[in-house]
UniProtKB/Swiss-Prot annotation:
This protein's name: Pre-mRNA-splicing factor SLT11
Family: Belongs to the SLT11 family.
Predominant place of localization: nucleus
Alphabetized InterPro entries for the sequence: Cwc2/Slt11, Nucleotide-bd_a/b_plait_sf, RBD_domain_sf, RRM_dom, Slt11_RRM, STL11/RBM22-like_N
Protein location: Nucleus
Pfam family, one: STL11_N
UniProt feature, compositional bias: Polar residues: 347-356
Keywords associated with the record: mRNA processing, mRNA splicing, Nucleus, RNA-binding, Spliceosome
Gene: SLT11
């Protein structure tokens, strides 16, 4: 009986017993219970049906025993061909995304890796053909298991390997564990939560959170205003335009959206007093964002993204406690909208030119 092309493809469907998964996806527990589903899904790379493994890893952090359920997304053949994890599709050696790894190897190696690859082809039949040919090569020469001839990882020169190591060290903390023989190191931005909170508390204690625009400070050297309640959709140019129109020339404007606050420094004390006088009760509304404004000298608003984020959470919590939260926090504080500037009436659309 003559076999058809569909029968040949079915013969090459993958049925494996053990997946190729990185240590990050496996979790901290060396004893993992997995479920196996034969031909459970199509491979994300070659589109052939393959054996799907599912498991629930345990997290290494304290206070949380289990992570989210994981499964294999690519077949073992494509995993060997790309030298990547079947679950997260990161490089098994360096923990890098495949696009970054291949781009780094292409820069270091002359000529790149010729021939067809799964990433360069979009046709389903071509992908299956490439996977089948590579599978035959694996059967003929088991050395290809460690020598990745398609991506060139196994044949990378020392310069390319050095570049990959540098990229792996520069990637986020979860990829540093791929470096063998190194201890668990955390970057500066991933410090202990208690130490981070203590540092941010010191920063927040120096900010004029309880201040206002009145009275005017006696110190004539203060020419800056502190504002908080900044949301992500409030651009810096809107803030700059407002203070330029109400005050005058600005010498420095610092807006940290992650910390939900910022400073504006005027060139003269008179310009700062003029801008403060245009703000009623220390409250200002720009693009629907309710800001709190106060006199204050420029201070540090966090030297890292973690510090700025933590400071922003403290500021949002303070604003909610005072009933002056932004419009993104729901209905709280809607009845505390800032009154209009002195001398300007409120115009409603239904009243035409009538002023109240």
């Amino acid at each position: 009986m003559q076999t058809t092309k569909s029968d040949t493809n079915k013969i090459t469907w993958e049925d494996t017993e053990v997946p190729a998964v990185c240590t990050q996806c496996l979790g901290a527990n060396p004893y993992i219970r997995m479920t196996k589903e034969k031909y459970g899904a199509e491979c994300k790379m070659c589109t052939r049906p393959f054996t799907v493994f599912r498991w629930q890893p345990e997290r290494a952090q304290k206070g949380s025993s289990r992570g989210k359920p994981l499964k294999t997304n690519v077949c073992l053949t494509c995993s060997r061909q790309k030298n990547c994890c079947q679950s997260c599709s990161l490089d098994l050696t360096y923990g890098l995304p495949l696009a970054i790894r291949d781009a780094a190897l292409k820069m270091e190696q002359e000529g790149g890796g010729g021939g067809l690859s799964l990433s360069s082809s979009s046709n389903t039949i071509t992908k299956q053909f490439i996977a089948q040919n590579y599978e035959e090569q694996l059967k003929q020469d088991q050395r290809l298991l460690t020598d990745n001839s398609v991506t060139g990882t196994g044949k990378a020169q020392s310069a390319a390997k050095g570049l990959l190591k540098q990229l792996a060290n520069a990637m986020p903390y979860r990829k540093e564990l791929y470096e063998k023989g190194q201890k668990d190191k955390r970057p500066a931005d991933s410090r202990d939560s208690k130490a981070l909170t203590a540092d941010v508390t010191k920063i927040a204690s120096k900010l004029p959170l309880t201040g206002s625009t009145t009275p005017v400070p006696k110190d004539a050297s203060i020419k800056s205003l502190f504002f908080m309640g900044v949301e992500d959709d409030l651009p810096e140019h809107v803030i700059r335009k407002h203070f330029t129109e109400t005050g005058g020339t600005i010498s420095l404007l610092t807006v940290v959206h992650r910390a939900h606050c910022g400073y504006v420094v005027f060139e003269t004390r008179a310009a700062a007093e003029k801008a403060a006088a245009a703000i009623s009760g220390g409250r200002l509304v720009l693009n629907g964002c309710r800001l709190r404004v106060a006199w204050g000298k420029p201070r540090n608003l966090g030297s890292s993204s973690d510090e700025q984020w933590k400071l922003g959470q403290m500021i949002k919590k303070y604003l909610r406690s005072k009933g002056g939260s932004s419009n993104k926090d729901g209905a709280a504080g809607r009845d505390e909208a800032a009154p209009p500037p002195p001398g300007q009436g409120i115009k409603y659309q239904s009243q035409g030119n009538i002023e109240l």
